[in-house]
Amino acid sequence: MAEKLPTEFDVVIIGTGLPESILAAACSRSGQRVLHVDSRSYYGGNWASFSFTGLQSWLKDYQQNHDSEEGVTATWQDLIHETEEAISLRKKDETIQHTEVFCYASQDVEDSVQDTETLQRSSPLEASATPADSLDSASLPKERQSAYSTSYEVPSRHTEESDRELSLPSANVEDSLEKEKYCGDKTDMHTVSGEDKGEHKLVVQDSIEQPKRNRITYSQMVKESRRFNIDLVSKPLYSQGSLIDLLIKSNVSRYAEFKNVTRILAFWEGKVEQVPCSRADVFNSKELSMVEKRMLMKFLTFCLDYEQHSDEYQDFKQCSFSDYLKTKKLTPNLQHFILHSIAMTSESSCTTLDGLQATKNFLQCLGRFGNTPFIFPLYGHGEIPQCFCRMCAVFGGVYCLRHKVQCLVVDKDSGRCKGIIDAFGQRISANYFIVEDSYLPKETCSNVQYKQISRAVLITDQSILKTDSDQQISILVVPPLEPGTTSVRVMELCSSTMTCMKDSYLVHLTCSSSKTAREDLEPVVKQLFIPEAEAEAGKDELRKPRLLWALYFNMRDSSGVSRSSYCGLPSNVYICSGPDWGLGSEHAVKQAETLFQEIFPSEEFCPPPPNPEDIIFEAEG
């Protein structure tokens, strides 16, 4: 460690996920001295995004379950006084399970002899990436290993040109985050390591047309690794949602850039169709008859102020939204569009009131930035936690990645947490402690019942619904394919989102888990895509996009866990959960705001920063 950290802070935050990062920004903005640490080598925790080879290295790190104690210079037990006790923090992250990787893309020997030799050294079902120690971290502030930083430089990226930009408040900014370097990977299929450069900003852009794509090989994906920014959890943002409102209010929006989600799709009678969202879309639709257009507009108009017409749904409050739609004399395809593509809810678990509220929310978000209710961050959702970390650092927050915390120090008499002891044996005191739940020891979580999220990440060669433009960002909810299964949310990203290489698409699939991720999601993958080898052999419809690469994994969902479920927590220790499986990031924002108001009830949550022109300096002397 190059130099020691200060020994006293107001707030210590462990973990750099979205809720922790929002809290760090809010605390720092209100004048608190903040220390924000993470044992990982990258920002975001389970909200992070990775390059192609970086993701594979991350997978290897999980499978190897590294628990090294490098750099430990003192035994923490010796630093605990007689009047104190310690809560030892977990050293191994166990929130990701059942990782499986499949590579369907061909190996192009001419592209890279060296890459091919590396692949051939591995077995066809298991290959390992470049060793973790040869890869660095993707960290927002560039920093020395375990050294702390009070400055916050942001990754400098040079985006490709776009036709036109529409900003939430945005500005060009410098970047110090090298987005490409991560740690270790060992998975079920081909994995290698190679990298390239990226870029940064915060704006909503229109689509760009690009020339027809060529065949993509695995070697090309490795060479273009840094063109990929692959989210562990990928969520669109409601244009009128609480996260966008917070980004604008706090002026954190200037650190990021967005694009409109251009299409809402539906999976109906075995094919993918585009769903009309706005009034103009409805009446221009060729999929709906004139009678259906009138029926749809009448129902959507009712949903906008459904609270004023409670007599319309009073008798159906306890019914499912699906059953309620059947009473409105809507055709089956309209019911399907409303349930799965507008309300985006479950057929079985969504009540009438929840469905009406979801539909109203969808409609209220239309038109703010584009023709759909959603926008998506360039470079992936992993950018958002980094933006809030940057704001924290701007107001004096201290950041330190690769910095393990061994334990919380608790005063026996008061029951309050007094400080932490890090992996270097340094004791750091604070008034409040915010901890990501993955760091909590098993004893503390013994009564907790977690849910699971099933995730799949795919790289494909074309869109699931081809149009004149190949730069479409699409959201599709696939209804349950069999009784007892759940609906699956599909998000398809084009290369202009800066999340994948040119001529490819990055596809995210998400659902609540009932089995392993592969068991939950593979039926949907088979419905929408065809592995490249089968396409070459002509074994399936050539109209389907070719599947080049796939990753499946399960992620823990702790969003529904209440504080009372944790055992023996000191009163001044607050817990943040990981991502939930729902649409948007409203839960993370609400959690951060609730905890902030609990800790600092008299302070405003993330107020706008002062305008430099309004700052008055007192004359000296």
From Swiss-Prot:
Q: List the InterPro entries.
A: FAD/NAD-bd_sf (IPR036188), GDP_dissociation_inhibitor (IPR018203), Rab_escort (IPR001738), RAE1_2_domI_C (IPR054420)
Which Gene Ontology terms cover its molecular function? GDP-dissociation inhibitor activity; GTPase activator activity; small GTPase binding
* Domain of life according to the entry: Eukaryota
One family name in Pfam for this protein? RAE1_2_domI_C
Know the name of this protein? Rab proteins geranylgeranyltransferase component A 2
Query: Which GO terms of the cellular component aspect does the record hold?
Result: cytosol; Rab-protein geranylgeranyltransferase complex
Q: How does it assemble?
A: Monomer. Heterotrimer composed of RABGGTA, RABGGTB and CHML; within this trimer, RABGGTA and RABGGTB form the catalytic component B, while CHML (component A) mediates Rab protein binding. Interacts with RAB1A, RAB7A and RAB27A, but has much lower affinity for RAB1A, RAB7A and RAB27A than CHM. Interacts with the non-phosphorylated forms of RAB3A, RAB3B, RAB3C, RAB3D, RAB5B, RAB5C, RAB8A, RAB8B, RAB10, RAB12, RAB35, and RAB43.
Q: Which cysteine pairs are covalently linked by disulfides here?
A: none
> According to its UniProt record, which protein family does this protein belong to?
Belongs to the Rab GDI family.
Using the UniProt annotation, give all residue ranges assigned to the region (Disordered).
113-171
Instruction: Tell me the lineage of the source organism.
Output: Eukaryota, Metazoa, Chordata, Craniata, Vertebrata
Q: What role does this protein play? A: Substrate-binding subunit (component A) of the Rab geranylgeranyltransferase (GGTase) complex. Binds unprenylated Rab proteins and presents the substrate peptide to the catalytic component B. The component A is thought to be regenerated by transferring its prenylated Rab back to the donor membrane. Less effective than CHM in supporting prenylation of Rab3 family.
Q: Where does the protein end up?
A: Cytoplasm, Cytosol
Name the GO terms of the biological process aspect.
intracellular protein transport; protein geranylgeranylation; small GTPase-mediated signal transduction
Q: Which UniProt keywords apply?
A: Cytoplasm, GTPase activation
